[in-house]
Amino acid sequence: MIRSYDPFSGEAPQATFNITFINDGGAECRFTPLFDLSQPPFGLSKGAGKAIGYQLVNLTDSQNVTPWAGRSLITPSTHQLVLAPNESKTLLYKLVANPAGVPEAGTFTQDVTIEAQGQGFTSFGGTRLVLGLEVLPSARIGLAGAYSMNKGQAVVDLGELRTGLVQTPLQLRVNSTGSYDLQVVSSNSGKLRLGSTDWTVPYTISIGGHAVNLSGAGLLAGPTGTGYRSDSAPLPIQFVIGDVSDRRAGTYSDVISISVTAR
């Protein structure tokens, strides 16, 4: 089982496992370890929906033993195991899932049988095991549009402050394995402040057309339902400036923190 996979980590979903073969008979035993699908079709799934492709590799003998057609393929280069009476040998296998095929969070599995097959398709025994991939609920956010970076922080220039909507093209991009929530926190509770003075200008913000409450921790619920969501439809971020009359000249600013939580 590949545990706790984060599809946005940039890492390949993979795990290794050992299988030990024991000859408890009184004669030498020659066989080829093969994987059979207990129930086609091929792929890790929840029982319905899109399946995730994978590969099985025998790392001990450097052989691909993936049961694409329902059973591991035997080729002229396939190694046989030869065990003397009461001898055992452990093989190391690696399961690698296709990260591009992950449709959503959840646990995706496939039941297989590992079989010791001798000549003439003779079976010396086998056992069932479950191949699986556990995909964690996960989400990532990023900005696009008119902003710059300064000491690791995104800086948005609102220009000369005027009451009303600021024409600044800015979008929030969200990648998620399903539903998500956004939290927005304003250091000045929805006010642009002149340095460390008490001079402030109120403002509001909306994300994706939804107003955010900046007086506390503003919460926004993302789309409901399951399934992988990409950033193909970025969420516009808009700023509306309040009353600027009778304010001292200078640079007014606030620090906004936006975080995302996958559900």
Language model features with spans:
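Surface-exposed helix/loop patches within compact recognition domains
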Residues: 205, 220-222, 244
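Surface-exposed binding patches on compact interaction domains or structured appendages
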Residues: 27-85, 192-217
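N-terminal small/polar-rich segments of proteins
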Residues: 1-46, 80-83, 87-199, 225-263
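Phosphate-binding glycine-rich loops and adjacent basic patches that engage nucleotide phosphates
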Residues: 72-77, 132-133, 165-167, 216-221
